[in-house]
Structure formats: C-alpha cells, structure tokens
Amino acid sequence: KELAQTLDTDCEIYACDLSDGKSCIKLERKLSKRNDIFVFINNAGFGDIGDFERTSLSKDISMLNVNVRATHILTKYMLRSFKKMNRGYIMNVASSAGLLPGGPYMATYYATKSYVTSLTTSINGELKAAHSNVHICMLCPGPVDTNFNNTAGVTFALPGISAEYCASYALLQMFKGKVTIVPTFTMKAAVIASKLAPRELAAAITAKQQMKKRKDNKH
C-alpha cells in the first residue's frame, strides 16, 4: 500500500502467499479473467547460503515452492490468458545463477533459478514455433541492491546495481524482444566464461565467489 501511494497509476493489491500452491491458483484465476493485463512479471524469490546438508530443509522447501512452483503456476495461467488474446509479455525474474552450471553453498537457490531459465527458454521456443504475439523473457541479473542479501544471509563480493536501473533496463529489453536479459557487462562476461569452462571448473570458481559472500565465513 505504501508503494502504491508513491505511484501515479492506479494500483490494485491482491494478498497471496506464493509459497502455497492453492493460493497461487486462486490468484491466477482472478487475474486470468481480466483482459486489461498485458505485462506479467514473476518477481518473487529468495535464496539461502550454507553447506547443503546444513541448511534448513523447511527453508529449502519454501524456496522451491516460491522460486519454482509459484513461478510455474503463474506462468502457465498467464500464458494461457495471453495466448487467448494473442498478445502480452511475461518476464520471469531468474538470476545469473540460472545461467551457470551450479553454485556450491547456494545449491538449492542455483537449482531453482536453473529451472526458471530452462522453463522460460523452452516456452519461448514453443511461442516462436507457433508465431505467437506473446513474448516471454527472463531477467538474469547479478547483484542488485535489494533486501535479498539479508534474507539469504550474504554479502555480495561484487557491487550491486540499483533496483531502479535493473527494472528499467529489463523492461526496455523485454519490449525490444530480448529473451535472455543480463543487465551488466561483468555478469555477461562471467556467463560467457562459465560456458567455455568445464562444468566442474566453473562450479569451483563459483564456489570461491560464494565463500566471499558468506557472512558466517566458516571455511
């Protein structure tokens, strides 16, 4: 509500627990009945850091529910709605993590974002083959100055970009028809380098970066 008051446009607020599958379905049933929505952005998600066997299982499951299940449900419903209208844009906010082979010490988070990038790439292929006017894309940023750090318990080794810049850049690229959106040159270079290196080597390099993020710094 506080955010809505700062905007010039009219806002409608829907309360939804995205970690609950039934709540996601109820939300999408409401949204899919409308014909005045043509941009949908899956932006919810969170991470956690630590050795895989030591991280909280309940937090892992909640992360899977929000990052994977909710994204899957919301994307499917909005895609159906947009295809009926033969127009619309869907942006799935993934991460540069989803373009890398793996992320030791953030194993679950990296796996969830790999799901998002794979799903989005596959749906894009289907839409292109059908010559659809619906466009789907994925935003894969590196560090962004949001509350993600506190939730995940990390301190980024690289400087983050502002949320405002990330959002404006992402929307501009989406409307240009870009499918994979990586906002900064540094992350673009890192993604390209990881694809050239063997998977195990790329994961080992990522592990070193993850260790720099850990606030507990146990290793």
Label each residue range with its predicted role.
Residues P101-Y110:
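Active-site loop-to-helix junction immediately N-terminal to the catalytic Tyr of the SDR YXXXK motif
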Residues T75, T112:
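Active-site helix of classical SDR
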Residues N43-D48:
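Conserved NAD(P)H cofactor-binding loop of Rossmann-fold oxidoreductase domains
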Residues D51-F52, K59-L64:
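Substrate-binding pocket helix/loop in short-chain dehydrogenase/reductase
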Residues A15-K26, L57:
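The beta1-alpha1 cofactor-binding region of Rossmann-like NAD(H)/NADP(H)-dependent oxidoreductases
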Residues M138, T155-V191, K195:
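C-terminal helical subdomain
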Residues S95:
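Residue(s) in the substrate-gating loop at a strand-loop-helix junction
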